[in-house]
Amino acid sequence: MVEAVASFRRGGVGIAGMSSSTLEEVQMQETLIFSDTIKDLKMLKSQLYSAAEYFELAYTQEDDKQEVMNNLKEYSVKALVNTVDHLGSISFKVSSLIDQRFDEVDDTNLRVSCIHQRAQVSQACMDKEGLSQQSLVITAPKYHKRYILPAGDGSMPNAVPNFSEMRKAKNRAAQMQQVFSAAAASQAKAKEKQPSFSKLRSIARAPSQRARSSSPAQRPPSENTIPTKRADKRSESPIPRTTPLTRSGSLPQKPSLLKTSSVRVQMHTSEHKKLASVRSQADRNDDKEGEQTPKKGKKFLKSLLSRRKSRKEEPLPCYFDDY
């Protein structure tokens, strides 16, 4: 029995080390040892039965029964010790086998957990890499940090307090802004209209000033119809004619004062009519003036140049022939 226990211990050490043989060979050795120990236990039972029969016969046949009793006691004690030892060896073998199996199970569980952990780590790395790649491709929707709301129109009034009041205030602010923008646009248009009106007014005033500067009393009485025509022509041209003869003309012609006053009244009335027509026309054409100002300027300059040329070619009126 002691040899069996020693051999089993050696087998257990070999299983723990696994240095000399493979796992299958060790398992075969363990099964053989276990079967041998079970056979020894069966043989022990038969030996005990045979010993009991022998002592029974000896006790009945021998005269010295005391000696037979002592031998029986010694044999029974030895047999009991051997059986206990044998049963202890078997229990040790069984417990060692169970412990080995549990150790193997623990080792396999540890290996499985390590493999599972490695798989989780690799999956996490793959997920991070995939997220980093997808984040460069997908354009995430942008919302305000404090107001990330679900879809739908009914979510806004429930999420924001006093939503109706805020909406009314927003509409009022938009209306006020529209009113202010319209007022600013009207002021800008008025500012743009003022220089154009002043231009037309200056152009319209130029003939009246020229007519006032040229007095009809300096002209001879025989040519009353001619000065009116010239005055009309001069009222159409914006550049006043300043000739030394008109300035140096003599003033002592009293009989023609009434005629000159009537001519002046007619000129003033015609000038007022022209000014009124010019102002109404300027008010109508203010919107189109920004586009037509360069063309009008060119035409105006051409007309001025042509009139100056025509006036240079005309003969100067001689006022000294009457004297």
UniProtKB/Swiss-Prot annotation:
This is Putative protein ABIL2. It comes from Oryza sativa subsp. japonica (Rice). Residues 185-323 are annotated as: Disordered. Binds SCAR. Involved in regulation of actin and microtubule organization. Part of a WAVE complex that activates the Arp2/3 complex. Belongs to the ABI family. InterPro entries: ABI. Residues 243-268 have a biased composition (Polar residues). Residues 295-310 have a biased composition (Basic residues). Residues 281-294 have a biased composition (Basic and acidic residues).
